[in-house]
Amino acid sequence: MNAIIYHTKGCMKCKLTAHLLNIDTKMVLIDPIDKPNDPIIQYMRRNNMKSAPLVRIYDDDKLMDEWNDFKADKINKYKENKDGRTN
């Protein structure tokens, strides 16, 4: 299982999400001025996602879940335990 976390510069909720999730995670900075990020920013706007991070959870390249903002319940569902298993 792995995650992609789309974050904004200096976002503490984004850093905390990555830290607590504790699975293989790719962090991707999103900046409204940076054109390569435009598809993600437009996706978030279309789906009324107004707060970073945008978190996508994958299992074998299949999207399993997605959310935005800091969501402790979602993090707890997918975080890796010390023995390497997810909850």
Predicted regions and their residues:
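Short alpha-helical
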Residues: 12-13, 35, 73
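Gly/Gly-Pro-rich "capping" loops immediately C-terminal to redox-active cysteine motifs
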Residues: 28-30
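Thioredoxin-like thiol-disulfide oxidoreductase module
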Residues: 32-50, 80-82
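Charged/polar, solvent-exposed surface patches and flexible loops
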Residues: 23, 42, 46, 73, ...
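Local sequence-structure signature of Cys/Sec-based thiol-disulfide redox active-site neighborhoods
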Residues: 1-26
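Non-catalytic, surface beta->alpha helical segment in thiol-disulfide oxidoreductase systems
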Residues: 57-86
